[in-house]
Amino acid sequence: MTAPNRPPARPVGGPPAARMMMGAGGPPEKLQDFKGSTKRLLKMLAPQRALVGLVLLFGVASVFLSVLGPRLLGHATDVIFDGVVGRMLPAGVTKAEAVEGLRRQGNGKVADLLAGMNDVIPGQGIDFDKLLRVLAWVVVVYLFAWVFGVFQGRITARVVQTAVFDLRNQVEAKLSRLPLSYFDKQARGEVLSRATNDTDNIAQTLQQTFAQLITALLTVVGVLGMMFWISPLLALIALVTIPVSFFLTTFIGKRAQPQFVAQWKTTGRLNGHIEEMFTGHSLVKVFGRQHEAEQTFREHNDQLFASSFRAQFISGMIQPAMMFISNVNYVLVAVVGALRVTSGSLSLGEVQAFIQYSRQFSQPLTQVASMANLVQSGVASAERVFALLDAPEQTPDPAPLEMPPVQGRIAFENVSFRYTPDQPLIENLSLAVEPGQTVAIVGPTGAGKTTLVNLLMRFYDVTGGRITLDGVDIATMPREQLREQIGMVLQDTWLFGGTIAENLAYGADDHDEAAIVRAAEAAHVDGFVRMLPEGYETTLDEEGSNVSAGQKQLITIARAFLAEPSILILDEATSSVDTRTEVLIQRAMNTLRTGRTSFVIAHRLSTIRDADLILVMENGSIVEQGTHEELIAAEGAYARLYSAQFAQAVAEVD
């Protein structure tokens, strides 16, 4: 059974230059709920709490060891400095005697510096054994920090990819539950962009920010603790950077958010245009519209360039600003630290460690700030995907019904339907079709012919009245159970990339090679298939370009026959085939329609004159019904339609 294929809506906008000035087709839209979308994005990780806990555990271990490293290096610096100073002092005196001697010589500041050095021994040089032990511990600490970081990265990749894997499954399941009305209102490229590009962007955002944010926050806490341990005064100086960094990040981030939203919306529109032009490239060339298609592409591309440039430029200002703040902090710490060393309040190694910590303290803040563009981009994509997941679904299916074999009696009882509340399309339509009847539905464009079939298939649900199958309201039947009884052939043929046999068997669960061949013979597919080098194993490309339009139509008809439905729906099934092929199809149809209720929406004389009942629709209502001869004799709407559309065809046949 094939599904309806509707053209996507096409975006409309003003001149490209004007749109570029505005960002992306107008003022950029802000994220509707940044906090809510962020929380929902993080909740995707909830099913993997244990692994998230391991990420946190390895992060704590890695950060703890990384924070311990500068302290050990500071101790190594003290060992070296103590040895250098000790060698300059006379041997045979104590440190206290050396300090007192310096004070007597008027070198009070040097004496204060020496007094603050704990392990200096006058006359003794660098203790290399002690230095090597300290450096060995440094190597061990950084080695294990790296190992824990590797484990954290591996588990993070598992957590993120599993979450995105589940998200893709949710999107796929959601698409199957959405009503046809959703796809009527959305460009196919836009839906594809949400299901692919936006999902991939979410994966990239989580992969590049999740563990890094955890590590950055832990690093800030750990480094801050070590800084206060070494010198509360210098720690307070370093703390000044936090509110300044937060203010700058927030200020810049708020201005980048709307641009990221515009970037991903424009990406969806661009994908929609590309998909539309690719699927219809033959018609674009036939009507000489390549220039217009290229112009539209350039307009969308200009919009995407403008919004992407603004988003990246604005968000990219964060990192230089953070580097400036970090450098100012570095200068302040170095100056104040040097003064503290000369006063003997701190050792040189402690100041050296503190300077390293100030860099370590600024680095995660800079990382968090620079990740703001990734986070905003990811949340913008998440909001688009969540909008898809939150779209109203079709009404839930009831439990399967126990039904006797379907006879095929269809009744429309006072059916009303409207696509939008203020635009009624069908009002109080009543119709009874007996089993085995062939009903032709004709009428001008927009009369409601296809809508009638969509209601029968439950692509849409009626807004008033009911439709019954063998006396059972189809609204009480699961859609799958209903559609199993219906074979449908559309005017727009749909074939997927696969063999001819696989395409024929698409609508049937249980089938064998003999059944496929019988259906192909009935639809006159077998003849041309056996002329192909690989026969039924011939691989069709996605567009089926290696078979003709008429052959594609025959394959879709054979597919419906293989499903052995009780009801046939032919939506202009022969409008794209030549006269000879149409005659072959009609001969097969006359046999295959036996015992099946058939609905035919067509403008070809051959599908109308032989129908048991012809319905003439105008403005959603049946204005006439009867056989071909009866309606011609009535000289009403059908006769006028016949004269306008079919008289020439009759003359050609006669």
Describe the residue ranges of each PLM region:
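Alpha-helical membrane-protein architecture signal
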Residues: 34-38, 42, 53-54, 168, ...
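Hydrophobic alpha-helical membrane-associated segments
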Residues: 61-65, 69, 139, 143-160, ...
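Membrane-integrated ABC transporters
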Residues: 1-69, 73, 79-138, 152-156, ...
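ABC-type nucleotide-binding domain
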Residues: 397-398, 403-654
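Short intracellular "coupling" helices and adjacent cytoplasmic loop segments at the cytosolic face
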Residues: 22-29, 81-85, 161, 169-193, ...
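An intracellular "coupling" helix at the cytosolic face of ABC transporter transmembrane type-1 domains
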Residues: 47, 180-181, 197-206, 210, ...
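Transmembrane helices of ABC transporter permease
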Residues: 51-64, 208-263, 332-346, 363
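Helix-loop-helix
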Residues: 226-240, 310-383, 388-389
